[in-house]
C-alpha cells in the first residue's frame, strides 16, 4: 500500500499489505482464510464486498460514501489480491503474472474514475486542484466539514492512482499523473500526519522514492524521516512501515543487510498484541516471510 513497490516494476507499489484493511473486521475466521488461502479470500471479497458497493451506487450514483467505498474496495482488491498474486507469480510464470497485473490495472483505473467523480461531486475546485500543475495547497478545505470522509477519499484515490501508474506498463498517460499521488498524500499529512496510524506517511515513502524531482540522496533522507515518523505514530505496532521501507528503499538501493534487518524487525512484532493492526499485520507477516524466502531474487 505501494506507495507501492513490485518485484517487477519499481514504480510505486508498496501498499499491498498496508492497503488490505479489507474486511475491516479482525475476526478469527477472516484472519484464518487470509492467512491460509488468500486466493479464496480474494474471491469472497470480490463476490461480496465489490458487489455490495456496486449495488449501492446503482441505487444512488451520487451517494458520496458509496463512491468512496468503491474507490477503497476496487483498490484493495487490485492491490491486496491481484497485484500480490502477480508479484509472487512473477518468479514462476511471467506471462501469467503480467496477465494478473493487467487485470489489476482495470480495477485501479475504475477506482480512479470513481475517485475523480467523488472529488467533482464534493466541490469542483477539488478536482481542479488535483489536476492542476501548480503546487497550491487545499488544506483549508480539508480542515473543515467532514474531514474523516475527505481523508479517506484522498488516501484511497492516491492509492488508486499509484496502482494504475505502476500497473500501466509505463504508459505515459498514466506516468504524468504521478504528481497527483503526492498532492493527495501530502495534503493529508499537512493537516494530520497521524491520521489512520500514519498511513499517509508510510505511503509517501514509496512516492518519494519514485519522485523524479528529487535526487537519490534527497529521496533517501526524506524517506528515512517518513519511516521514523510512521513508526512513532503507530507505536511500533504496525509492520507496514518496515515492509514499505524495505521494499521501496533498501531493495531499490540494493542494501541487502538492511532489507533483512527491517523484515526481521517486522516479524518480531506480535500480531496478537494489538487488535487494531491484527489484520494488516497478518498480511504483512506473510509477505515478509515470502520476501525473505526469495531474497536472492531481489539482490544482485
Spans of features found by a protein language model:
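Short coil turns that delineate tetratricopeptide repeat
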Residues: 61, 123, 193-195, 235-236
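Acidic-aromatic/histidine active-site loop/patch
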Residues: 288
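N-terminal secretory signal peptides that target proteins for export/translocation
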Residues: 1-12
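Short coil/linker segments at helix-helix boundaries
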Residues: 31-55, 59, 73-187, 199-229, ...
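Sec-dependent signal peptide recognition
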Residues: 12-20
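TPR alpha-solenoid repeat register
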Residues: 66, 198-200, 241
